[in-house]
Amino acid sequence: MIKPIVKDILFLGQKSEEATKNDMVVIDDLIDTLRANLEHCVGLAANMIGVKKRILVFTVGNLIVPMINPVILKKEKPYETEESCLSLIGFRKTKRYETIEVTYLDRNFNKKKQVFNGFTAQIIQHEMDHFEGIII
């Protein structure tokens, strides 16, 4: 189900909790909401649709990839960039890493470990910041 994007900074500033199998419907809601916003958005964290759980989705080409309880294990090659967010107006400066290694659960709760580079790595870092209440 397509959900409205949360813009309440006080809500978005709160930390998210670990997701469980009971939160599976959130993945479908995130995917539906991202599809509805693809013109302006490449990723979403669950708190952006009002759910304080550690779930995110992002685009890779035509695919939408969900990540449950992701953790960055390694990060390399820091750089400065500017980002925008559906929850905010305009662009903000931030620090990101060119390469990250992430462990996460897929939508079937299978554990995965993967290396991401470039813009995909940037999207994942941005969405994971939401879990910590960090809004670029």
From Swiss-Prot:
Record GO terms (molecular function): metal ion binding; peptide deformylase activity
Residue stretches spanning the membrane: none
UniProt-recorded name of the protein: Peptide deformylase
Keywords, in A-Z order: Hydrolase, Iron, Metal-binding, Protein biosynthesis
Organism taxonomic ancestry: Bacteria, Bacillati, Bacillota, Clostridia, Eubacteriales
Binding site residues for Fe cation: C85, H126, H130
Family to which this protein belongs: Belongs to the polypeptide deformylase family.
Pfam family, one: Pep_deformylase
Function: Removes the formyl group from the N-terminal Met of newly synthesized proteins. Requires at least a dipeptide for an efficient rate of reaction. N-terminal L-methionine is a prerequisite for activity but the enzyme has broad specificity at other positions.
Cofactor: Fe(2+)
Enzyme superclass (EC): hydrolase
Gene that specifies this protein: def
Keyword 4Fe-4S attributed: no
Swiss-Prot/TrEMBL catalytic activity: N-terminal N-formyl-L-methionyl-[peptide] + H2O = N-terminal L-methionyl-[peptide] + formate
Active-site residue list: E127
